[in-house]
């Protein structure tokens, strides 16, 4: 008996950070598509504010 293996689906998460290309820790909310490190560095320039 042979089992047929199918390739895993990627679900569209193959794109990395638009700034550095990292694929882990992505912030995709609001269409930002940045890793969390790049988001922390550029959040003020984008228009996000830190409250505390």
Curated annotation (Swiss-Prot):
GO terms for molecular function: rRNA binding; structural constituent of ribosome; zinc ion binding. Binds 1 zinc ion per subunit. Zn(2+) binds at residues 17, 20, 35, 38. One of its GO terms (cellular component) is cytosolic small ribosomal subunit. Signal peptide: none annotated. InterPro entries: Ribosomal_uS14, Ribosomal_uS14_arc, Ribosomal_uS14_CS, RIbosomal_uS14_euk_arc, Ribosomal_uS14_sf. Pfam families: Ribosomal_S14 (PF00253). Keywords: Metal-binding, Ribonucleoprotein, Ribosomal protein, RNA-binding, rRNA-binding, Zinc. Belongs to the universal ribosomal protein uS14 family. Zinc-binding uS14 subfamily. PANTHER family: 40S RIBOSOMAL PROTEIN S29 (PTHR12010:SF2). This is Small ribosomal subunit protein uS14. It comes from Picrophilus torridus (strain ATCC 700027 / DSM 9790 / JCM 10055 / NBRC 100828 / KAW 2/3). The lineage of its organism: Archaea, Methanobacteriati, Thermoplasmatota, Thermoplasmata, Thermoplasmatales.
């Amino acid at each position: 008996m042979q089992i047929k293996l199918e390739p895993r689906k990627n679900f569209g998460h193959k794109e990395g950070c638009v700034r550095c290309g990292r694929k882990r820790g992505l912030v995709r909310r609001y269409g930002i598509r940045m890793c969390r490190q790049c988001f922390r560095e550029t959040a003020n320039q984008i228009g996000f504010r830190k409250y505390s």
